[in-house]
Design a protein with these regions (language model features):
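Small/polar-rich, solvent-exposed N-terminal microdomains that initiate assembly or binding
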Residues: 1-43, 49
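Short Gly/Pro-enriched loop/turn and capping motifs at secondary-structure junctions
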Residues: 41-42, 64-66
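Residues at secondary-structure transition points
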Residues: 46-47, 69
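Short, solvent-exposed beta-strand/turn "edge" segments of beta-rich domains on protein surfaces
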Residues: 47-50, 91
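Short intrinsically disordered coil segments
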Residues: 49-54, 75-77
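Oligomerization/assembly interface segments of phage tail-like spikes and tubes
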Residues: 53-64, 95-104
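Acidic-leaning, charged glycine-interspersed low-complexity segments
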Residues: 72-104
Length: 104
């Protein structure tokens, strides 16, 4: 959990609102904001014991328009983690979701 706490701190350093998984009903701030959550674990097992464990985490940046400056803020915060990036436009919400997949 310490790794997730560190990630949370790095995401908060962007100045954007940050939440784990989802905002409580009716409490979501206006755009932009960040959401992150654990997708799955990758334990490395040796001699019938977990030798090393990492977690795949999804970090989602939601913006009203394509926002290169905020993407750069997030990418700077994620500098210690290798990431892959995907962009999705959510037409029903009229917003962009920039997805960063990282391993912590």
């Amino acid at each position: 959990m310490e790794k997730l706490t560190q990630l949370n701190d790095k995401l908060k350093s962007t100045g954007l609102p940050v939440v784990y998984r989802a905002w409580p009903e009716g409490e979501a701030p206006g755009l932009p904001f960040l959401c992150y959550y654990c997708e799955d674990d990758n334990p490395l097992i040796a001699d019938a014991a977990v030798f090393f464990a990492s977690t795949n985490v999804r970090v989602e940046l939601y913006t009203e328009t394509k926002d290169f400056a905020r993407e750069t803020l997030v990418e700077t915060a994620l500098a210690d983690y290798p990431w892959q990036k995907t962009e999705i436009y959510i037409s029903t919400e009229k917003c962009y979701m920039i997805l960063y997949e990282i391993e912590v």
